[in-house]
UniProtKB/Swiss-Prot annotation:
A GO MF term: protein tag activity
Keyword Coiled coil (UniProt): no
Miscellaneous comment as given in the Swiss-Prot or TrEMBL entry: Present with 1310 molecules/cell in log phase SD medium.
Cross-link Glycyl lysine isopeptide (Gly-Lys) (interchain with K-? in acceptor proteins) per UniProt, renumbered positions: 76
Record carries keyword Aminoacyl-tRNA synthetase: no
CDD domains membership: Ubl_NEDD8 (cd01806)
Listed name of the protein: NEDD8-like protein RUB1
Pfam families to which the protein is assigned, alphabetical: ubiquitin
GO terms for biological process, alphabetical: modification-dependent protein catabolic process; protein neddylation; regulation of proteolysis
């Protein structure tokens, strides 16, 4: 299945998934395409963060749906 991920800049990234894939796998694919480490990624659907440990099925992700990618930046002084 194909799921779309939209960044804060408005860029839309399509990722191909299997129902048994973990949500974390989406972050790995985004790292390959965009160079953003998974530890800095948060995937949001309907205003809630999706747990990395869930499978695509358990997270209720379906073909064509759109997730939002939010980056968490490490704070400094």
């Amino acid at each position: 299945m194909i799921v779309k991920v939209k960044t804060l800049t408005g860029k839309e990234i399509s990722v191909e998934l299997k129902e048994s894939d973990l949500v974390y796998h989406i972050k790995e694919l985004l790292e390959e395409k965009e160079g953003i480490p998974p530890s800095q990624q948060r995937l949001i659907f309907q205003g809630k963060q999706i747990d990395d440990k869930l499978t695509v099925t358990d997270a209720h992700l379906v073909e064509g749906m759109q997730l939002h990618l939010v980056l968490t930046l490490r704070g400094g002084n």
